[in-house]
Amino acid sequence: YEPTSPLACLKMAQHKFQVFHVSIEKGGYDLSGWDKHLGNNHLRLPARDVSHLAEVVLATMQIANGADINEVIANYKDPEVLKRAFRNALR
């Protein structure tokens, strides 16, 4: 058995899968490492939007499967929630 670093595990997973991570923003945590390693696949969900987590995951799956991000956002009942969650991808 050889220990594997978290970053090495992430890289291995990225060879086979589209890897996403949703961070719930509560303040005080440095999330830049997730941005660095996942880029647009790091979703930041403000704590006030946590009740929308399932919808954010569903929207992520739709976009990963080819749906247009702007259409997915526009068709959601509260587009501002998805705009906040996908702000890395919308820059």
Identify what each model region corresponds to.
Residues Y1-R91:
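Acidic, glycine-rich A-domain
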